Amino acid sequence: MNLVGSYAHHHHHHHHHHHPHPAHPMLHEPFLFGPASRCHQERPYFQSWLLSPADAAPDFPAGGPPPTTAVRAAAASYGPDARPGQSPGRLEALGGRLGRRKGSGPKKERRRTESINSAFAELRECIPNVPADTKLSKIKTLRLATSYIAYLMDVLAKDAQAGDPEAFKAELKKADGGRESKRKRELQQHEGFPPALGPGEKRD
């Protein structure tokens, strides 16, 4: 173009410190605004493609669907039923097997946990001198039960009379309990039987 050529020509003279051409001050203006005017002419095409894809969709090649069609298809596959609280049919079908497995897992785990807690509650009831308002952890319950079993075995070995539960001291910080006397009576009734079966009772 003449514009670029004239600019290069005058810029060459200016670089070598020749006396400036009278038209030189005007060259910067067409050089700066010339490309801008060309970009301004090309910009509407980019705007129509970037900012309004719905309008530009018919111009896409026939090899693939326009984006708007793909979006409509994706929306239709989930449909208006995809509200909170309602699963789309496709997702429900895909996650059905896993969902059933997950659903049965927590129920089974919950039953197992309830069974364990029930067994620990029964075990706590068997330990004497534990206040009714005392909450024992599972590990503490096991340790107290183990020590109580050891105590009972020791009682049998020593051939004690009726195995007085007062001799067993549950290692707790709280010493008093409302149901303590009831437990003592129950244990005294139960304790009357095991010593009779002990190995030291067989005497001639």
From Swiss-Prot:
The modification Phosphothreonine is found at residue 113. Residues 8-22, 98-110 have a biased composition (Basic residues). One of its GO terms (cellular component) is nucleolus. Residues 100-152 form the bHLH domain. Keywords: Activator, Developmental protein, DNA-binding, Nucleus, Phosphoprotein, Transcription, Transcription regulation. The modification Phosphoserine is found at residue 115. Gene3D superfamilies: Helix-loop-helix DNA-binding domain. Phosphorylation by PLK4 disrupts the interaction with MDFIC and leads to translocation into the nucleoplasm, allowing dimerization and transcription factor activity. InterPro entries: bHLH_dom, E-box_TF_Regulators, HLH_DNA-bd_sf. Its main location: nucleus. It comes from the Eukaryota. One of its GO terms (biological process) is trophoblast giant cell differentiation. The keyword Transcription applies. It is found in: Nucleus, Nucleoplasm; Nucleus, Nucleolus. The keyword Cell membrane does not apply. Residues 1-24, 57-115, 172-204 are annotated as: Disordered. GO terms for molecular function: DNA-binding transcription factor activity, RNA polymerase II-specific; protein dimerization activity; RNA polymerase II transcription regulatory region sequence-specific DNA binding. PANTHER family: BASIC HELIX-LOOP-HELIX TRANSCRIPTION FACTOR, TWIST, HEART- AND NEURAL CREST DERIVATIVES-EXPRESSED PROTEIN 1. Transcription factor that plays an essential role in both trophoblast giant cell differentiation and in cardiac morphogenesis. Binds the DNA sequence 5'-NRTCTG-3' (non-canonical E-box). Acts as a transcriptional repressor of SOX15. In the adult, could be required for ongoing expression of cardiac-specific genes. Efficient DNA binding requires dimerization with another bHLH protein. Forms homodimers and heterodimers with TCF3 gene products E12 and E47, HAND2 and HEY1, HEY2 and HEYL (hairy-related transcription factors). Interacts with MDFIC. Interacts with SOX15; the interaction enhances HAND1-induced differentiation of trophoblast giant cells. This is Heart- and neural crest derivatives-expressed protein 1. It comes from Ovis aries (Sheep). The gene is HAND1.
